[in-house]
């Protein structure tokens, strides 16, 4: 299987580069990079992306920067992207003591307040994609709000969550005030 996977990935990479030699190629991976290395496909694209949810699906928030350093050591000459990260936030839930998987607005803030500075201070991270801009329907979800993935920075009814304003404050040139 791994040999076949490498053949297919090599063919796709070669085709992309033959059609547009200026276009960057990227492989999105989940956090278990060794699987992709065993298949030999991490060497093929120009960029590597990783879906990282340290402190949400498991582990703790501090595991995020540890994982970033680990990936940089594994792939020192490869620009890296964080292709997915986020925490479910239900705008109806608040907590004075937010914890992982409580779906509170406050844990969502803690999560993004931890991740964003860690991403921005590393020059080998060339991009990051919050999962997701908007909450969206997902039939299989059975969380605080059934059938909805609440990782968006904006709710399904377009209410901007606290995380939305955090990104504005970091990335907008004009000052942002959100109370």
Task: Give the location of each predicted region.
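Substrate-binding clefts and catalytic carboxylate motifs of secreted carbohydrate-active enzymes
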Residues: 2-34, 39-179
